[in-house]
């Protein structure tokens, strides 16, 4: 099988009822695009504002268990941390009576680490967008696709890969984007590696730069924030990396910048690599999944403590004042 898919056929989904479970960030966008592509879509959600929004936007909306009962294909588009409980209470009992069913996940996490184990009779697939819902809709309106990872954990029907590719087309990823053949385990590893390594390293480096510049060198908070990220330069660099490549985009910077970046990248590489190796092992052997499950069971004490520590830091307070001055929207205000 080719490792990349640039287009697919919607035929496996035609004549079937597709239940989108969760009408949040991904659910709303995927349901809307599939409906535009002529597929029969219903929505399953708890009775909250998203339930009412789905009704307002013209979908048939049901409680989650009823939506699964009425569906031939279900897309689970709810947060990882609540999915296990929702699956066990609302979905698993319904699946016991299904002879042929397709269960699609947008994340590999729960299946990869054994938190959810669908019946052997169920096609268990993954279509994992590499983009948030808002970004997907922006691209869709421009007639463009976006990247997704595809995986199959169980192929009860012999057609699981066909279903995965068809969903990728149905939700607008292809054509125009790219679907990469992957696995639940691979997606979970890559997703968590980003969240555990370069993202916190970047955030930590920015905070350290701010603290040292302001406290030890007398730099104004405004100047520090604008230099490190608030000006938008960091976002522009990220855009160029996505479009041109991480090293190719360096030609847009001065030679001084290029030299400083390259010399320090190789200088710190061994230290960073050891961090990444340790985190990858911790993820792959299931240790993080256990840590996160215990944190949830305890009521998120570490999470809330660290969130408060971050948002009450001097950098966060200075950022809030600067963004107000610049007329930017400040959330949680």
From Swiss-Prot:
Belongs to the ketol-acid reductoisomerase family. It comes from the Archaea. Pathway: Amino-acid biosynthesis; L-isoleucine biosynthesis; L-isoleucine from 2-oxobutanoate: step 2/4; Amino-acid biosynthesis; L-valine biosynthesis; L-valine from pyruvate: step 2/4. It catalyses: (2R)-2,3-dihydroxy-3-methylbutanoate + NADP(+) = (2S)-2-acetolactate + NADPH + H(+); (2R,3R)-2,3-dihydroxy-3-methylpentanoate + NADP(+) = (S)-2-ethyl-2-hydroxy-3-oxobutanoate + NADPH + H(+). Residues 183-329 form the KARI C-terminal knotted domain. One of its GO terms (biological process) is isoleucine biosynthetic process. The gene is ilvC2. Its EC number is 1.1.1.86. GO terms for molecular function: ketol-acid reductoisomerase activity. Residues 1-182 form the KARI N-terminal Rossmann domain. Keywords: Amino-acid biosynthesis, Branched-chain amino acid biosynthesis, NADP, Oxidoreductase. This is Putative ketol-acid reductoisomerase 2. Transmembrane segments: none annotated.
């Amino acid at each position: 099988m080719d490792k990349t898919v640039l287009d697919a056929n919607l035929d496996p989904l035609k004549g079937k009822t597709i239940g989108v479970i969760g009408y949040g960030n991904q659910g709303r966008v995927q349901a809307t695009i599939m409906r535009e592509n002529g597929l029969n879509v219903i929505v399953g959600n708890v009775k909250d504002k998203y339930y009412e929004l789905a009704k307002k936007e013209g979908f048939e909306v049901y409680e989650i268990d009823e939506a699964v009962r009425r569906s031939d294909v279900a897309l689970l588009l709810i947060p990882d941390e609540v999915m296990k409980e929702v699956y066990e209470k609302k979905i698993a009992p319904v699946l016991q009576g299904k002879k042929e069913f397709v269960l699609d996940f947008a994340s590999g996490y729960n299946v990869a680490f054994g938190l959810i184990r669908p019946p052997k009779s169920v096609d268990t697939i993954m279509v994992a967008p590499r983009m948030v819902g808002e970004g997907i809709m922006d691209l869709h309106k421009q007639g463009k696709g976006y990247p997704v990872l595809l995986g199959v954990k169980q192929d009860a029907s012999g057609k699981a890969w066909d279903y995965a590719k068809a969903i990728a087309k149905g939700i607008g990823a292809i054509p125009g984007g790219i679907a990469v053949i992957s696995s639940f385990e691979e997606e979970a590893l890559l997703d968590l590696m980003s969240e555990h390594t370069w993202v916190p390293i970047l955030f930590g480096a920015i905070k350290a730069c701010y603290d040292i510049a302001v406290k030890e060198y007398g730099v104004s908070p405004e100047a520090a924030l604008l230099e490190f990220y608030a000006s938008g330069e960091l976002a522009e660099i990220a855009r160029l990396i996505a479009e041109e490549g991480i090293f190719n985009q360096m030609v847009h910077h001065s030679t001084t910048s290029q030299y400083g970046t390259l010399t320090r990248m190789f200088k710190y590489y061994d230290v960073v690599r050891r961090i990444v190796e340790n985190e990858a092992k911790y993820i792959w052997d299931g240790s993080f999944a256990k840590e996160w499950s215990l944190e949830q069971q305890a009521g998120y004490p570490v999470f809330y403590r660290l969130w408060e520590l971050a948002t009450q830091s001097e950098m966060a307070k200075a950022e809030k004042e600067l963004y107000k001055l610049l007329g930017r929207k400040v959330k949680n205000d």
